[in-house]
Every structure is written in structure tokens, then in C-alpha cells.
Amino acid sequence: MSSSPSIAQEFLATITPYVEYCQENYTKWYYFIPLVILSLNLISMLHTKYLERKFKAKPLAVYVQDYTFCLITPLVLIYYKSKGTVMQFACDLWDKNLIVSDPKAKTIGLKILGIPLIETKDPENVKAILATQFNDFSLGTRHDFLYSLLGDGIFTLDGAGWKHSRTMLRPQFAREQVSHVKLLEPHMQVLFKHIRKHHGQTFDIQELFFRLTVDSATEFLLGESAESLRDESVGLTPTTKDFDGRNEFADAFNYSQTNQAYRFLLQQMYWILNGSEFRKSIAIVHKFADHYVQKALELTDEDLEKKEGYVFLFELAKQTRDPKVLRDQLLNILVAGRDTTAGLLSFLFFELSRNPEIFAKLREEIENKFGLGQDARVEEISFETLKSCEYLKAVINETLRIYPSVPHNFRVATRNTTLPRGGGEGGLSPIAIKKGQVVMYTILATHRDKDIYGEDAYVFRPERWFEPETRKLGWAYVPFNGGPRICLGQQFALTEASYVTVRLLQEFGNLKQDPNTEYPPKLQNTLTLSLFEGAEVQMYLIL
């Protein structure tokens, strides 16, 4: 027999005197509030014990206690987020035992605003959530707190809606689409102008990368670049027609995403953060997208077929004429197309600027493959030749290991189920997961786990990707998620990041960082990861 009856008997023995007292003072209804809370906790406890017996699971090995009625945890997270250290705090929970008492624990239980959560960095649990037990988990509240900005798109939908979105979008990321690197070159020429104007002085290259990727992403998605890099500081003006809301789009998009990240921390209480500035930003973003959607809808099927070149929105308009569907999918892909690549490039050049030996080794490979400076053979850079650059791939892999684009995510159980690890001695036994329970997985912590990557897990070392152990990582390395929801735009992001890196190292022979720059850097986590304080670097021309 289970221990549940003894738990119940002990509970009843504890509360019986209290119940008798409440009966004598029945007019004072508030005496019953603690009784209700205790009863609900007992029911939850008994349900957990029942599931553990049913699934042959063990109790969670590590549970974080919050003695402030679960109110302090979200405040702590919001504080650290405002300082750019929330993701470092998430890693320190495990590595420095800030809250987790067992240094070997990879799965813990905690509560936020009274809501029980599971937090894991265990690759086996990540594999279960994303792949082997995919149908046991859904996006939960993600649709609710992202809907106001992204609507019903591939990143917010579950079930049949998600499958339909994926079927509709998959052809748009076929190899022939993502391999057209030559479309990036005009944007690179403008980027070069911005870097040269600093004459070797310190500047924030992250800000330029975000402008570069929004320009290239809008050209790919809309057929018309936002041309945010073309400004008076480099003697250029946009060549495309201006319209109301265009100039405000980038700032509004950034603000709305930042606000969404805070809503994520509050989980079911996300609706608290819905201020006027947030709503105004969303309206600007929607107006920007609607402008292009309307232009696409004004084209007949015959017009669309006659269009030369590839434009994501036009191809999508051949499948649906619903303006909301077009806007929602467009914004979902724009988040990934702009932010993922910009973040990757920013972290890559941040690390190269403080690791001159890695920078030199990468330039040597690029010189051998494509030449440098006046001898650069730009016409030889292609999807195929970029894939043959082994050290470049290692540098990108290492960047995505230490700084994964989506460092923290969650799912919600759709049924009573289990996770393979986290219970019993050493946390190696299965644990029971209740229907509706939130399970968070922190890929940033997985990618920096010393049990997996060794004592130098926090060190930027691309050479590890040539070692036999690293080639057997499996679910310990998932920079683009995994399973059925693996990122459709993975090759798009990797190809663009590779091309930009090669072209910058062909053009600039020196890359430095202020020796007083803080390390590890503070991290900004909105829907994707970026540098909280930018990437301040110095770049010099090849002479």
C-alpha cells in the first residue's frame, strides 16, 4: 500500500482541532481560508502520489522552497532581467548553488505566484519534451501572451493550426530560397560604409547587425527592403517609397518584444503587463505589416505568377488571400529572420574581438577559400562553398552553444505523464507530471553544463567541435530546438550569418575589444537572445 493514507491521517489529526475551533466561531468565515488552502495542498499531494504509483515514478529529488508564498521569485526574475543578468542567474542556480542545494541536480521544482513549475536542463528531459513525448506537451499560455503581437502563426499555434502553418511555410525555406546569398551583397556594401565611418574607433556592431538583418529579412519576406541602414550618416537615403509608420517600425518592434519577455516571466499572470505604450507599439507593427499585405492582395493570381525572383509574401499569397493569416505568418517569420541572425552575429563578433587567435585562424581559412581585401573572390562565396568552411562552422557552433538564440522555453503538459529524469536518488528516475503543469527547459544551462562539455564549458573554444566527444552530443546541443518543431529557418540563419562573417573578415583585417569590457556579457532575452549592452568593438580596414 502507498503512504497516502498515513499522510491523510496525519493531515486530519493536524487540522481537526482547528476545524472544531472554526465550528465554534462559524460566523468568522475567514478562519476557513487556511483550511481551504491546506485542503487543496493535501489533494495536490495525494494526486502526485497517485501518479507516481501509476507511472512507477519517484518524488522530485530537488524542490526549491520559497517562504514568501511564492511572491518573491517573479520579483527576483524581473529584477535580474532589468539588469541584463537573468540568464546568468538561471545558470548560477545550478552552477553556484544559489538556490539548488544539489550541485548535480539537473531538474528542480519551484513555484511562481503559487503555480508549481518544473525547471530542467537535462538533455533526456529536453528530448522527451520536444520529440519522444511531443504529444504530451503543448505551448500552453504562449499563444495567449504572444497573440497580441504575433497572432495565429507558426510560433504561437498548436495542433492542427500549427501543422497547417508548417505545411504552408516549409516550401518557403527550400534550399533554392535560402541559398541565394548574393541578395545580401548590396546590404553588405552599406554596412561597410557604416563601419568605415568610425575610422577604427569603438562602435556598437550589434545595432548595425539588427539593421542589416531587418533590411535583408524584409527584402526576402516582402520583396522590398526596410533600408534602415541607408541613412544620412553614410550619405544615403532610402530608395523605396516612404509610408506612415515605416520609420517607427523598428523601435516599436523592439519595445513590443521586450514587453513580451516580461509577460513570459509572469506566466498565467501575463495580462498584467498591457500598458498603453505596449498597445501602441503593437499597432505600429501591425500597420507596417498590413501595408505590405495589402500590396500583395492587390495583385491578381496572374500578377503573382509573373513576378520575377522569390518573395516570401507573394508565394504565401498564392496559398491564401486572408489578410490576417498573411500578417500573422509574416510577423512570426520576421521575428526569427531578423533577431536570430542578428543575435548570432553580435555574439560571434563579440567573442572574436576578445579572442585574436581565433580571429586570425578564421581569417586564414577565409583567405584560403575566398581571398581577402583587394584579392577577395566574392563571386565564389555560395551556399555550397560556405558549408565547406569547417572552422567557420565550428565558430558558429560554439557561438550558438554559449549563446543559443532561444535560451529558455517552456511547455505545458496536455495529459498526466512523466519526464525520464529528475526523481529519486541523484535525480535519475522518472518524475510524474500533472496535466496542465508547466515545464521549463533552459538550453543555455544545458549548453554550459560542465558534466557534458567539461570544466571549460564557459570558455569560447571552437576547437571542441573537432573532438570526438562533441560529435556525440545529441540532445545536449539544440540551438534550433528539435523534434517536430525544429526551426524551419535554420539553414537560412546559418547561411546568412556565414556570408556576413566571411565578407566582414575579407574587408576588415583587425577586430578589437576594449579590455575593460565586462565578461561574461550581460544578456538581453526578449523572444531571442542578444547582448544587453551591445557589442562595442573596433574594426580596421585591410591595407
UniProtKB/Swiss-Prot annotation:
EC numbers, comma separated: 1.14.14.-
Residues bound to heme: 487
InterPro entries the record matches: Cyt_P450, Cyt_P450_CS, Cyt_P450_E_CYP52_ascomycetes, Cyt_P450_E_CYP52_fungi, Cyt_P450_E_grp-II, Cyt_P450_sf
Its membrane topology: Single-pass membrane protein
Subcellular location(s) per record: Endoplasmic reticulum membrane
Topological region Lumenal: 1-28
GO MF, one annotated term: heme binding
Function per UniProt: Together with an NADPH cytochrome P450 the enzyme system catalyzes the terminal hydroxylation as the first step in the assimilation of alkanes and fatty acids.
Keywords: Endoplasmic reticulum, Heme, Iron, Membrane, Metal-binding, Monooxygenase, Oxidoreductase, Transmembrane, Transmembrane helix
Transmembrane intervals: 29-48
Organism in which the protein naturally occurs: Candida tropicalis
Cofactor: heme
Pfam families (UniProt xref): p450
CDD domains for the chain: CYP52
Lineage per the UniProt record: Eukaryota, Fungi, Dikarya, Ascomycota, Saccharomycotina
Protein known as: Cytochrome P450 52A1
Induction comment: By various alkanes.
Intervals, Cytoplasmic compartment: 49-543
The family this protein is said to belong to: Belongs to the cytochrome P450 family.
GO cellular component annotations of the record: endoplasmic reticulum membrane
Enzyme superclass (EC): oxidoreductase
